[in-house]
Amino acid sequence: STPSNSSAASDVYKRQDRPLGIAGRVIVRSGDVFAPETMLYRSGRPVLIIPNLAIHLNREVNKGVAINNQVDLMPVADMLPEEQQSTDYFLSFLAEELAVKKEDILDFELNTYCVEEPAYVGIKETLLSSPRLDNQTSVAALLAAIVEGTRTDGINLIALFDNEEIGNTSKQGAASILLHDMVKRIYRSLGCSEEETDCAMYGGMLLSVDVAHALHPNHKEKMDITNHPVLGDGFCIKEACSQSYATDAKAIGILRQLCDQNKIAYQRFVNRSDVRGGGTLGSVASTLFPVRTVDIGIPLLSMHSARELMGRTDFDALASAVTAYFCLLYTSDAADELD
């Protein structure tokens, strides 16, 4: 059998009845026991689908029916006669795709993904509907910005962590010591003393870049009456007294001045005070790497759905803000950092 699982953070029912591809890594036998080969794989086409139960057999569906992950999210690959069914049917397919022997596949970490193409939406095509806007928009903005970064008084660095949607607590997640140790090793390789390294680290600033919730036109009551971002008005600066967003007032001041100087559109986002919102890795990372932090990102509708919706110009604003940040000469005295 092929084990499968799902993330509790996604709207799982919206994955039903959609053509799904699979992508990830496959671990293959090698000549070295401690170094099995890792092969990356992406199907590039639909190979799975999760068929919904027809309404005739599920009359209560429009009243809200709980999804059972074990029962309702079992994907279908093919419909075969019973005599052709085999427990290693999927392994045979995977081996053929990778041009390896079936018995050499030791394990795999594969995810399903929606293969539908992005599409511009609207009379003037001001919106973009696409899978995986959370959080590939942030990754794309960071990658574009660091290439353009020109500052010479320090180090620009981006960290693209895994497992944010399931709590960050993995060796490759933001709750690990990976970022802290990596930065120390970089400074050590440049010949800096421990004191110089600590001063440079704690004199820095962290942008936690993840998406935000936009005002839903059909559910305006879900948002704060004064701090609700809308699609197309710029990226968001996110705040929370609970520190689920790690933003502090001085970090906001720095970012607002930067955006005002460069004429970059931005908005403020605060959850309704009686609604617990989501969180980002910012508060987790800044605990292990205690520097000024600000949570930012583009606003979305339909977050965590199979297709999400964004304003086209908001990405440009986010990328411009991060680029300006990577070009800024940081002159703050590290001694007053954690005021």
What are these regions (language model features)?
Residues 2-9, 13, 330-339:
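Single conserved hydrophobic/aromatic residue that forms the stacking wall/gate
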Residues 7, 129-167, 321:
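Alpha-helical metal-binding/catalytic segments enriched in His/Glu/Asp
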Residues 18-120, 165:
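Glycine-rich, mobile lid/loop segments that gate access to catalytic sites or pores
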Residues 30, 116-118, 160-168, 211-213, ...:
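Acidic, glycine-rich active-site loops and adjacent beta-strand->loop/helix elements
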Residues 58-87, 167-262:
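Metal-dependent peptidase/peptidase-like ectodomains
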Residues 88-104, 212-307:
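Active-site-adjacent substrate-binding region
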Residues 116-130, 236, 299-302:
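Glycine/charged-rich beta-loop-alpha catalytic/anionic-binding loops adjacent to active sites
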Residues 146-160, 185, 298-332:
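His/Asp/Glu-rich mid-to-C-terminal helical/loop segments that flank catalytic regions of hydrolases
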